[in-house]
Amino acid sequence: MNAIANLAATPRADLGECLADLAVDALIDEAELSPKPALVDRRGNGAHADLHLGLMQASALSLWPCFKEMADAAQRHARIDARLRGVLGQLGREGEVAMLRTTEGVNSHRGAIWALGLLVAAAALAPRRTQAGEVAARAGRIALLDDPAAASGDSHGERVRRRYGVGGAREEARLGFPRAVRHGLPQLWRSRESGAGEQNARLDALLAIMSVLDDTCVLHRAGRVGLAAMQEGARAVLAAGGSASLAGRRRLRELDRRLLALNASPGGAADLLAACLFLDRLPAALGGWAGSL
């Protein structure tokens, strides 16, 4: 990739490698988490005819150079402005090309490139300040800047935004990822504190996001009916005690069947779960970097 060639020399220490590792690990852990309603996981393809777990893993790995270069660019530039936004946009597009080459044209992680790319850059800008809300707010400040080289919006997500009047991934980022920071992460921590295992805590975090997100992936596939089924079903699982309880597990199976019948896959919520996992691990991962930067 050559988009950041003019952003000066190699950063001190390899913060970029650490952040790229965290981002890729978050994507792989999200993909492998099971049983997720209507999403690719260890059981199968969910509502996706063109995706499977191996492809999701390979796609995530293909994005490591993209995330590293985003972190390096932010660390070199050291401030949020239009120039950094343009560089990150170009790197994201190059990362998307690498992803599509790996998946032979299947869009497996376009939304994740956007969300995790912003968070990686935000973390690199201030590696001593790793509190989730602060990192997400910095990412939001980057997202508020326009990318002059971005293509005109005619993606599925853009069309859904216009049709249904929802904010989508762009607004979620510009607001500082509130569904991840205010819903997903608190639920992850609550479930851990209540004694749930890590996989159940992550499932509960996903459900908390699903319960409040206007997921454009679901709206694209199943409209308002699908969105209501996702949100109400996720709330029902949590109200029944979460994915670690017998009643919650029954509700989770019902939600999975309902979303599969509607061909509604909550891909936006999955991207935000990966963002949660990244933010959750960030303080421990960067604790050793603070003294050397």
UniProtKB/Swiss-Prot annotation:
Q: InterPro entries annotated for this entry?
A: CitG (IPR002736), TriPribosyl-deP-CoA_syn (IPR017555)
What EC number(s) does this enzyme carry?
2.4.2.52
| UniProt keyword annotations, A-Z | ATP-binding, Nucleotide-binding, Transferase
Reaction catalyzed = 3'-dephospho-CoA + ATP = 2'-(5''-triphospho-alpha-D-ribosyl)-3'-dephospho-CoA + adenine
UniProt protein name:
Probable 2-(5''-triphosphoribosyl)-3'-dephosphocoenzyme-A synthase
Q: What does the UniProt function comment say about this protein? A: Involved in the formation of 2-(5''-phosphoribosyl)-3'-dephosphocoenzyme-A, the prosthetic group of the acyl-carrier protein of the malonate decarboxylase.
The Gene Ontology biological process terms listed for this entry are:
prosthetic group biosynthetic process
Q: Give the organism, scientific name.
A: Pseudomonas paraeruginosa (strain DSM 24068 / PA7)
Q: Which molecular function terms from Gene Ontology are attached?
A: ATP binding; triphosphoribosyl-dephospho-CoA synthase activity
